[in-house]
């Protein structure tokens, strides 16, 4: 099975797309309840920061999601069970980034707005709800006796880690 730990992030529309593609193989996906959820707001902000700094980024919002979580603006896998919680989390995250972007030059604000131009929040919420059939919430300790091997998601960027990897980070 594949496991997303509390130290990684997932983007529900991508999980939905991958789950639909792999459905015939009946993949087993387990997610820690505190795995962080990446939103389009995280992705847009990540791209804005990357455009300013030019450090190298995959542009998928990983760093922004982790930083947002450290700033105590949370959205976890466990929240995906409740539509009203998803909506509340998205509103909080949108407000969080709006306040950060409002302090930036006009060109940065425009770039952020452009990144969000085609965002469909209803589709994002629908993706959050529709991925339920592709995963189970579980802590690794609960699964250790059931499986001998796991594929841990989220380790692909280790060589871009600013302390352990290679330039560009």
Residue ranges of model-derived segments:
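Non-transmembrane, aqueous-exposed alpha-helical and coiled segments at domain scale
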Residues: 1-169
């Amino acid at each position: 099975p594949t496991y997303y730990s509390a130290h990684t992030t997932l983007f529900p529309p991508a999980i939905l797309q991958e789950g639909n593609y792999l459905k015939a193989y009946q993949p087993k996906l387990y997610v820690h309840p505190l795995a962080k959820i990446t939103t389009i707001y995280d992705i847009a902000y990540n791209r804005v920061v990357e455009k300013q700094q030019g450090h190298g980024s995959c542009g998928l919002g990983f760093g922004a999601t982790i930083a947002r979580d450290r700033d105590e603006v949370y959205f976890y896998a466990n929240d995906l069970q409740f539509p009203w919680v998803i909506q509340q989390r998205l509103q909080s995250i949108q407000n969080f980034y709006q306040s950060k972007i409002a302090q930036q030059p006009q060109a940065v604000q425009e770039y952020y707005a452009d990144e969000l131009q085609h965002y469909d929040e209803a589709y994002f919420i629908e993706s959050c709800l529709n991925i339920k059939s592709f995963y189970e919430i579980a802590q690794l300790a609960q699964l250790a006796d059931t499986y001998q091997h796991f594929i841990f998601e989220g380790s692909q960027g280790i060589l871009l880690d600013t302390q352990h990897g290679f330039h560009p980070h």
